[in-house]
Amino acid sequence: DEYCTDVVEAVMTILDQQGIEHPHIVTESGRATVAYYSILLFNILDVSIAETGESIPDVLPEDVPEPVVNLREVLQGLSVRNLQECYNDAVYYRDEMRQLFITGRVTLRQRTLADKYFWAIINRIAEEKEKLKHTPKELADIDSTLADIYYGNFSVFQSLPDAWAIDQLFPVMPVHRLTEFPSRKAVISDITCDSDGRIDKFIDPQGMRTSLDLHPLVDGDEYYLGVFLVGAYQETLGDLHNLLGDTNVVSIRISEDGSYQFVREIRGDSVADILDYVEYDPRRILEDLREAAERAVREKRITPSERYKILQTFEDGLRGYTYFER
């Protein structure tokens, strides 16, 4: 309110001095005015396919541990009327089996069998809960548990810090293959080593959802996603978490007739740039490696040709992008 008062008072004072009639002031400051100018694009590097609970044996082995028997009974007794109870039981017996495995009292095959039953239960619960008018809170996020993990070539902390810091929801979608049906439910992980480096909340017409419909990856083809409305401060707020630097930037001007031109291209940070930011001298590091390689040649641990390849590869790495390059 004080900000608005100051703006209006300043405008009013100047207009009064000039004898100009006061206008109606219409303004929208902040995210709504600047979010539209920027889009984050990144490729998907790999995917972890969610467990489906398939290939469950018809007959249990004789030496099967009791938690596996209990998990099977949970699966057989599961119905739309006892979803919450079955979920709680499945988690309990799954955790019990994990503890037995940690203490060496069950085999890896036995634990794997328990996991298959657990995921079969979770899949059944996900199917049955769609019949409920009101989903229990504990089951609301079960779709994200069953979602694939798509690994994106980006850093949440560098490019989408508000998604992590204040749970800001950004529109996310594929930017190609739009005539194909997106048959996989997924969450998105970045390439940092931080468990918070993921997007698992997405915009939905009903408010929010915990997975995103994406296409299956095709071997040999790139798959690109776009995150929209990121023009509001994301580039300014981003930081060097895991030493992942600024991304490549392309500025595009779109004409009224739909044509466009590339106005400016800015290369993202190189590995050498980031090392310099954190006060490591890339030239000193390279020189240290050069001396070590020379010493290895003199001691006949590597050949001169191998020395050249080592130094060339290291120099290429210093000049390279901080993100994955194919």
What are these regions (language model features)?
Residues 14-20:
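Short helix-capping segments at alpha-helix termini
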Residues 20, 24, 29-326:
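Charged (often Lys/Glu-rich) extended helix/loop segments that serve as interaction or gating elements
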